[in-house]
Each structure stands twice: as C-alpha cells, then as structure tokens.
Amino acid sequence: MTDTPADDPKPSYRSDVTVELVKHTASDADVLFAARVSTLGEQSLDEMDKDPERSKGLINYLMRDRHGSPFEHNSMTFFISAPIFVFREFMRHRVGWSYNEESGRYRELQSVFYVPDESRKLVQEGRPGKYVFVEGTQAQQELVGRVMEDSYRQAYEAYQEMLAAGVAREVARAVLPVGLYSSMYATCNARSLMHFLGLRTQHELAKVPSFPQREIEMVGEKMEAEWARLMPLTYAAFNANGRVAP
C-alpha cells in the first residue's frame, strides 16, 4: 500500500492547547458513599441520593488526613490537543491514568506546529533545581518564531517527500519534530488528577512548590477548571489542604 500525501500542505502554527471533557462519572457524592462503606456497609448506598454539601466536613477530613482511596471512585475522560513534547511529559503519569494517542503509523500527521506567543517566558536563569524563567527580548522572540517556523517547514517537506516516494508513514514520521501537534484521550480519577495538578501546575496555595513546563501547565489549568465544576467540594478541600494529593 502506498501512502498518498496531501496536496501542497502548508504548515500552520499555534500557541495554545485545547482540552475537552468528553465524558465523566464524577461527583462529590462518589467520595462519600465510598468512604462510608467502612462504617455503614450496604447502608452507604443511601449516600448516593443525599446532598453532599451536608458532608463537606468528611471530604475535608479525608483530604487532610490523606485517606485517598475514596477519591478514586469516579472517572473523567478528556480529549486533548497539544504538542508532542507535552504528551511525552504527560505520560510520565502512569498510576490512575489511561491514554490513547493519535498514531503516526496509521494516519498522515497534519502540519500543525507549536510556536510560543509573546506571553511565553523564554530565558531560564539559575541552576538546575533552582531557577526562574524571565521574559525574552524582542529579538529573541523574533528569532524563536523564525527559526521554529523554518525548521518545521523543512521537516514537513521532507516528510511529504518521503510519503510521495512511497515510504511508509511509520518510517517517514521520524523526521518530524516534537513541536508537532498531536491529540489523545486521557482518562483519570480525581485522585490521579490531583497528583498531576500538584506536580504540573503552580499555585499560591500549594504547600509543595512545583516547576512545571508552561505548556503542560496550560493543559493542567484547563483540566482543573472542568474538575472544579464537577466536584466543587473535593476541589475546595484540595486547595484548603495545600494542593497535595491524598
């Protein structure tokens, strides 16, 4: 089978990420009935029909004292579009996560690439483990944009040339950079998401400092907003207890 490339593909450039909550079974009540089975047994099923606001103290207790398993009885599935380098960091998170990503073996990859906008700090100051990022100069911003776009264009032209010559997609993709956009489904529960947020976002309420790469933090912020809407009491307890996963 010969792979047929698209006609005269023109690269496009983005600086954003997108996150869509595609399905969920997640509520604060899920935490409560799971926790209360310890003392109520089958009577804990009654919690499924009660207003969880009555028991927000229990949720806070579980979070504070790090009784984590009740926070696992829920599920959220997100559809995420981001550069490949974001997904390579993302998939370091293995416990409580499931992933399926767009395949460069089975489809022709689209010519959409990441170029940071002016809000992205470009210069790292300090030493490993103790550093900050600061604004780049106008010249640095222009350099990054020009060099990235030139590099992406050359790489994608090489990819297309190989496809046109009949080279398999799984071979031709080797020339493509990690700034290429990919897409994936990621499924987690509240406990695994809290662990992710504790490491991949910065927040003034966090007891433990974190130094995430900005692009994965952008993904985390969007996932956090969706989760906060689904499980507001759990989310409030997470923040009240230093954003440390139980």
Stretches found by the model and what they are:
Residues 1-246:
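Family-specific signature for flavin-dependent thymidylate synthase
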